[in-house]
Amino acid sequence: MLQHYYMKLLLLIRHLELQGGLQLCCVMRNREQKHYRNNNYILNKHTKSALKPVNEASNSTLTKHKENKKQKVQAIVQATDQSLISREAYQSLATIEHKLPCEYLISSEKIQINKEMEVVIPIKLINMQTTRVDIGFYEEPHIIDEEIVNQMVSAIGKAGCRSIKDILKYIVLKLNNDGVLNATCSIINLRISGDGRNVGRKVKQVMVMCTILDDRKNLHFPNKHFTTVLYPGNEDYDSLKNAMALFLKELHELKEFGLEINDIIWQFNFYFSSDWKFLCICLGFNGANSKHFCPWCETSKDERGRLETNWKMTKTMEQLNFDYTVYKGHQQVPLFNMIPLDHWLIDELHVITWCYCKEMDRIKVKFQFWKEKGKGSENWNYTSLMGEDKMKVLKEFNLGLLFSPSRAIKIRELWNKFSDLYNDLHNDNTNPDDFEKSAKEWLALFLLPSKGNWIVGEEIISGLYLPSEITPYIHVLVYHVADMMRNNKKWGLKAFSCAAVEKKNHQHVSYFFRKTLKDGGVCKNGTSSIKELLYYENRVLYYNNTNTLYFPNSQKIYIR
């Protein structure tokens, strides 16, 4: 018993020592201050001059402290959004590092930003009239995660949308102040794009976005492409027409009347860019495998090998609006019929990708397959190459391993010339006339015929490709890309790349339709995922337009 009281006494003494020590530290710190109080004023210790009343100083300091704390919380919200850090992940970080604000402060600030932004840019959910899901058997799934697939399926029948007018009213003022837009020449060049992601073999995630072409330095950032429409379902004409009803109506109004923002009426030039499938759907046109396959000219599959014919962009949107049946292959009125046809551009990335993918298939480049680890797993995975990797394979692949020396030399010449076209396509200073000439020379080499007659004993020298192997993308590369360069010289074809659009769609699907990575795991269905995604889009606009946020970029240091 005596030992017990002795231990309690020691603890009490220790507590008093700590308490007294803390008080002594406070006294010493106060004595060392350079300012002290006198007659309700803060006085400078050296000059004795009054600075400001105590109550004003306290309020000012408190206000500044609150502002700094709020800015820090907003910066953390911004960081978690940009890095796609979930609530659960942040909770774990805050548990480890006590200096981080509590998770509830971050969530509360995020909710507050959502409320503020929904007043400015409301989010609307609409019922889709068609919910039929039909993904082609040969289409490759972009996302195969079962949880994401199930979340997407649960959201079928709903679409989310935001008003393009509301978005423009929110962002134009800052763009004008930053010098991106010019109020004295009140014209906005608006580019529209779309993309469909295959989520398993059950559903697609379709997104329609806009970006400001005038904001050149930011065109390749996904967050500078503003989502106006998104829905899980089918990537077809009827579904898009239903989901984009409000968007199409507003585009017609912008084209006809412009948009008044702060007493300035802004006029609009519209452009459209996407992959081949999405473009043809929006144009009400045949697919790439049809006899009449070109959206811009009236060529057909039977005429692909006629090198003497110079196919030009002869179709017009005016004629399509008057009677689309005049042009073979057009089956419905174009959805974006307010955009001139010479402002419809194919994504330069897909032009290149489909050309060299065909060659890689032909030369039968092999990749390694392996079985995924895991108990009872029957899934197989495989290596895949991105665009630059594929180009490197074709450029450096030893063709002599597959072909005779003479044929290997021809194929190497063909793909070296294609590499030159690839580089010219990405160069804004490329002369369209020179590109057109080089592209036609490349096509002539592509169609190099075989020589010799075995019947009379002549040696057979194999050619390269047949006219039937000219794909729609090759046709566009040779006959229409030069015209696209001429018509859009102000921007350059790189400005119409859809890489950022596809990246954004893939990231959003991977994150917002994985219920365990959002809302603390309480997301119940895909419909709420649609709203969460558009809330995120609104917050991105908030970050871009709020100058008070300070979110420093990380820097990489290289040590040699």
Model-based region annotation:
Residues 1-560:
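A structural signal for the principal folded core domain
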